Regions:
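Short, solvent-exposed loop/turn segments at the edges of secondary structure
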Residues: 78-82, 145, 312, 325
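Short, high-confidence coil segments that cap the C-terminus of an alpha-helix
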Residues: 44-46, 110-112, 290-293
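Short glycine-biased active-site loop of nucleotidyltransferases that positions the nucleotide triphosphate
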Residues: 41, 74, 306-309
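Short alpha-helical functional segments enriched in proximate histidine and acidic residues
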Residues: 20, 106-110, 287
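A gly/proline- and charged-residue-enriched helix-loop-helix capping module
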Residues: 79-126
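Aromatic (often tryptophan-rich) hydrophobic motifs at membrane interfaces
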Residues: 50-52, 92, 97-104, 224-334
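A conserved beta-strand-loop-helix scaffold within acyl/acetyltransferase catalytic domains
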Residues: 4, 8-54, 58-70, 121-270
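Conserved acyl-donor/pantetheine-binding loop and adjacent beta-alpha core of acyl/acetyltransferases
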Residues: 65-84
């Protein structure tokens, strides 16, 4: 324990942090300071931490401090989908425990009385490191919430003809992926990456979708444009077009070399009969598979910390041969 030093991140550590995350065993786009920087200054009270052992950087933790009533909470950075500790190499269990203890000690010394965070999905790890979860249980952390996300293994679709890929999907139930994809192909639907001039139209469709579901976007139009500027290769927008008109769109983030995360999928409902979201997701799977990626994560289909399942949304995702992965929220009073 005495060998560990916790340093609060500042801009002078930017290059060190970036290099560490990119070379780590479990870092993602959402752990990079470059990504976190798109948020307006002052939106969050940043408390990202760097953990050193004998002057060697061992782990980093993107985080912020929240004021909840009369108590301060250290939380996985609220500006990301997931966070948690990032390690440079496969850590031994003792090192994981020591790092968590060091974070707790830092928190207590700064009048922080609770620690909450969520790890990245295991599909984005370069190697399994379940010793992190094991250490959390050993140290008294609780699984506060568990969300169910859907992911797609892509290797099966790599370098095969479109028609052969279509045959791999179900053709029964409500979604009828095989039938609807073939129908879209016959109708001449176009799938392609959007250019920057088309982002406004995409966002207009997205807002209309969210209003239908009484929801609000996590990103403003300016946010999406800024992220696209920061990461021109790792933030992509794809559209599906019917007779030249944008009918659906997907915003995806390149999490790391393992795969991508769908942040928003949306559809112009006047084209619903053409099933543009079905065709769009099918072509996303094919595109990313042919580029050599392992997984596409479609995001959660649950609400209220996993207590409520959106069965219609989950049915759509599972009809594309999707499988469930757990996103766990850990917490502990200090």
């Amino acid at each position: 324990m005495s060998n560990y030093t916790v340093v609060k991140y500042s801009s002078e550590h930017y290059d060190e942090w970036q290099d560490f995350v990119r070379m780590s065993v479990n870092g993602t786009l959402f752990h990079e300071q470059k990504f976190l920087s798109y948020h307006d200054e002052g939106k969050f009270e940043d408390c990202s931490l760097m953990l050193y052992c004998k002057d060697e950087l061992i782990a980093v933790l993107p985080a912020a401090v929240l004021q909840r009533g009369d108590r301060k909470v250290l939380k996985s950075h609220p500006g990301t989908s997931y966070g948690g500790l990032v390690f440079g190499t496969i850590p031994k269990l003792k090192a994981v425990i020591d790092c968590i203890n060091a974070v707790e000690e830092y928190a207590r010394n700064n009048n922080i009385s609770r620690f909450e965070f969520r790890q990245a999905p295991k599909i984005f790890l370069s190697t399994p490191i379940d010793q992190i979860d094991f250490a959390l249980v050993q140290l008294g952390y609780e699984r506060e919430d568990q969300e169910l996300s859907t992911c797609y293994p892509l290797i099966e679709y790599r370098d095969i003809p479109i028609e052969d890929m279509v045959k791999l999907f179900e053709n029964d139930g409500r979604n009828k992926v095989r039938k609807n994809v073939r129908k879209a192909i016959r109708a001449g639907l176009e799938f392609r990456e959007l250019d920057n001039s088309e982002i406004d139209k995409y966002y207009e469709i997205l807002l209309d979708n969210l209003v239908r579901h009484e929801a609000k976007p996590a990103h403003s139009l300016a946010d999406i444009k800024k992220l696209k500027e920061l990461y021109p290769e790792r933030v992509r927008l794809y559209g599906v077009f019917v007779a030249g008109n944008m009918a659906a769109g997907y915003l995806i983030f390149n999490i790391n070399s393992n795969g991508w995360h769908v942040f928003y999928g949306s559809m112009d409902y006047k084209y619903q009969v053409e099933r543009p979201t079905t065709f769009g997701l099918f072509m996303l799977l094919k595109t990313l598979a042919d580029e050599g990626y392992e997984y596409l994560n479609m995001g959660i289909s649950t609400e209220d910390g996993g207590r409520v399942v959106n069965w219609g949304l989950l049915d759509f995702k599972e009809s594309f041969n999707g499988t469930g992965i757990i996103r766990t929220y850990w917490s502990k009073n200090l």
